Amino acid sequence: MTIYNFSAGPAVLPKDVLQQVQAELVDWHGSGMSVMEMSHRGKEFMGIAAEAEADLRELMAIPANYKVLFLQGGASSQFAMVPMNLLRGKASADYLNTGEWSKKAIKEAKKYAAVNVVASSEDRNFSYAPTQDRWKLDPNAAYVHYTPNETIGGVEIFWTPEAGDVPIAADMSSTILSRPIDVSKYGVIYAGAQKNIGPAGLTIVIVREDLMGETVAGTPTMFDYKIHADNESMYNTPATFAMYTAGLVFKWLKARGGLAGMEKINREKAALLYEALDATDFYASPVAKDNRSLMNVPFTLKDAALDEAFLKGAKERGLLQLKGHRSVGGMRASIYNAMPTEGVKALVDYLHAFEKNHG
């Protein structure tokens, strides 16, 4: 039986990548060492790190005036690092509130700045994203922060906000590398790796050079982007094995047509699943159609009393980790880059079969 893992994160990794990791685990390229054993300053690992950065730059077409940082601490640490680095003498920042992760970012930013919530979708249980004509931007804000894809709620924003000269900061943890974006429109992009990049423990930050070097008073050394940039992400020991695995994922993506190729596949996968959910009233998708995520698909059963039976039957078919987040309930299928189309088709087949037996 083929197993398909729909976990929101840590999440499915490409089978090809896992097999390469397995083959190289004990002896990387004849070095006599596992990547886990290498000095992060040795020539072997320095080469791995440089190649990973070069491949990510190529995949995302990252301009030369942006630094790529391989950090730790997850997006949750970035909720503090963004204001610490981007306030740059200003007192306030703009935040869009579209779900649980937006709320966490807002809560943390309030420790360092006056937060202006430009718009919120909490009025409809975070089931949509407010269009920009509804935003109340502050021209004096240090930056504008938003979450393009809310992992829990499955709400995605497919356009990039316009804020004039005010830098845009984006938590792309669950959407990065799923489709092309114009990096030059952002001041800072950050993402925990454990959803669409690689193993947990790695956080990728892409930051425009002119936004580094002026931190708020009392900023810890480890929270200063410029320190990490000046030390090529090796101020402290980085998450070496996670960086190596991420580098293999970058090569896997390049071999599949890059981000344009992945977007085509991801849209096809998402369409299959949403069409199945929309075809019946036995299931429901709570998200407005314009904001339905390509990566995280929450859905509910008409009768919540059937939830446990649904999950049990799914597990018996090898469909794992479909339980929704504890804060919202229901189901959630995360269909990241590494989820093959066959996995989505298997889930759709199960949706039909379960309804036939219980509808």
Curated annotation (Swiss-Prot):
PROSITE patterns: AA_TRANSFER_CLASS_5. Its cofactor is pyridoxal 5'-phosphate. Coiled coil: none annotated. It catalyses: O-phospho-L-serine + 2-oxoglutarate = 3-phosphooxypyruvate + L-glutamate; 4-(phosphooxy)-L-threonine + 2-oxoglutarate = (R)-3-hydroxy-2-oxo-4-phosphooxybutanoate + L-glutamate. It is found in: Cytoplasm. The modification N6-(pyridoxal phosphate)lysine is found at K195. The keyword Amino-acid biosynthesis applies. GO terms for biological process: L-serine biosynthetic process; pyridoxine biosynthetic process. NCBIfam families: PRK05355.1, serC_1. This is Phosphoserine aminotransferase. It comes from Thiobacillus denitrificans (strain ATCC 25259 / T1).
